[in-house]
């Protein structure tokens, strides 16, 4: 396996170091290449993501990312120049966000005994919607200013995400929920709903449901156990995945995969939390989400048994840690010891 590592900014290098520690335990011999991308490189060279680096990244099997963002860089510069560019250049049309409440982890929800287990995954479209930069503004700064952000949805883009979601549902509990707002967003909503129905005919064993996005947020709080696989567009997915993380114990336990399902490009895996510059360098950042990202990476590369080993070790750690606050390295050491 050839792995590109982008530790990034803030706590990124600290949590990635622990994720790599776990990877070395379960999958020795990985060929690793570190890339200095983020605020430090931007300040030193003015570069964000050179074309030459993109070409090098394409030669790897996967990418492990820490975190990007620093208050010394204007907002949006690194996010658009690095993260969004990677998303479009490497065709990350699927953003995968598991949502599971692990034993021993507290949820802010008042869950009743006997409620269904919270264990779902959100398959979010990653390259379309209103994030394509298709829009503009006129008469800026005047009382007559007009601004638009056009949401782009293509049959090609929707179909490939929906098919991936059905495939995941077949490997899980065989239930898929489309989340959209087709009573108001009638054109895009119709495309999504017709596509789900059409492709769903190829998966008769998968039970299909639909929820408006506002109803889905209610049910994610009142009855999250109803969900198995959720498929949705870029914007709605961006919103409900953060709610899902909160329901499952916080964004510090949320891992994600940015996936090119065609496997033409290396997919990228990362913890969802930000760079947290206020605690960077103190050795107190929780690396659990970064370690969970390694599990997603391994599963994507077909190493399911190895990924399951990491999952079980993380589950065991979370079940026993209680209110204990461990240093970053200590978390990695404890999970590594369990392996």
Swiss-Prot record:
GO terms for molecular function: 3-isopropylmalate dehydrogenase activity; magnesium ion binding; NAD binding. It holds the Pfam family Iso_dh. Its EC number is 1.1.1.85. Its cofactor is Mg(2+); Mn(2+). Pathway: Amino-acid biosynthesis; L-leucine biosynthesis; L-leucine from 3-methyl-2-oxobutanoate: step 3/4. Homodimer. This is 3-isopropylmalate dehydrogenase. It comes from Mycobacterium ulcerans (strain Agy99).
């Amino acid at each position: 396996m050839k792995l590109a590592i982008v530790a990034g900014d803030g706590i990124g290098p600290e949590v990635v170091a622990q994720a790599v520690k776990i990877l070395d335990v379960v999958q020795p011999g990985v060929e690793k290449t570190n890339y200095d991308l983020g605020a430090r490189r931007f300040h030193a060279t003015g570069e964000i993501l050179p074309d030459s680096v993109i070409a090098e990244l394409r030669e790897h099997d996967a990418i492990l990312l820490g975190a990007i963002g620093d208050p010394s860089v204007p907002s949006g510069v690194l996010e658009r120049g690095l993260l969004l560019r990677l998303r479009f250049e490497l065709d990350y049309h699927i953003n995968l966000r598991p949502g599971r409440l692990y034993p021993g982890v507290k949820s802010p929800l008042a869950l009743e005994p006997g409620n269904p287990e919270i264990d779902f995954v959100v398959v979010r479209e990653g390259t379309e919607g209103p994030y394509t930069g298709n829009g503009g503004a006129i008469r800026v700064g005047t009382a007559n200013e007009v601004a638009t952000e056009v949401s782009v949805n293509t049959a090609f883009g929707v179909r490939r995400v929906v098919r991936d979601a059905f495939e995941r549902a077949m490997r899980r509990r065989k239930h898929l929920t489309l989340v959209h707002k087709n009573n108001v967003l009638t054109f895009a909503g119709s495309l999504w709903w017709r596509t789900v129905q059409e492709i769903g005919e190829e998966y008769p064993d998968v039970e299909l449901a639909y929820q408006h996005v506002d109803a889905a947020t209610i049910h994610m709080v009142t009855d999250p156990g109803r969900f198995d696989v959720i498929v949705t567009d870029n914007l709605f997915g961006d919103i409900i995945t953060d709610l899902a993380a909160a329901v499952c114990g916080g964004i510090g336990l949320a891992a994600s995969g940015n996936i090119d399902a065609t496997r033409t490009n290396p997919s990228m895996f990362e913890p969802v939390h930000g760079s947290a510059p206020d605690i960077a360098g103190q050795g107190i950042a929780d690396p659990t989400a970064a370690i969970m990202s390694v599990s997603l990476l391994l599963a994507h590369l077909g190493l399911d048994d190895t990924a399951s080993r990491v999952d079980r070790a993380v589950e065991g750690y979370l079940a026993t840690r209680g209110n204990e606050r461990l240093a970053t390295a200590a978390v990695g050491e404890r999970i590594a010891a369990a392996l």
